[in-house]
Amino acid sequence: TVEYNYNSNHLEGNTLTYGQTELLLLFGKVSGEGRLKDFNDMKASEVSVRMMREEAENRQQQLTQNFIRTLHRALLREDYTEYQTLPSGVQTSFVIHAGQYKTRPNSVITRYGDRFEYASPEETPALMSDLVDWYNEAERKGELTPVELAALFHYRYIRIHPFEDGNG
């Protein structure tokens, strides 16, 4: 899981080296320079990976929205405030709630400059319920390989983007 955590966290801007990541996750030690947040994020990522592995190994347990929210809470660790500058230059802030579905719309600018809007906050709980039901039924039927099931789940999940941050 060192390689997964290292690469996943670097996509989010984590500055730890591979060696620092390995030392932290395998031996619980810290070496060299690094932001405290980066070390904490890496440890939280490892906890989340372990939670997913344990959940996957427990074949008697179906996937639930509660597990997804608990996993998100473990990954983010705590609520925090996000600060942004709007195109008009106005400063704004809002709280990211760990383990809670989004309360604000979220979107991304595509490589073509278009804005892609994810599911609205109002739609999100029902869409997540549908997604979890679909996943559990698809797993029960066994018609998809684990890789196909994971890929389709991830695609549908990312299209919803249920949290304000930490959806990756």
Whereabouts are the PLM-identified features?
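FIC/Doc superfamily catalytic core
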Residues: 1-167
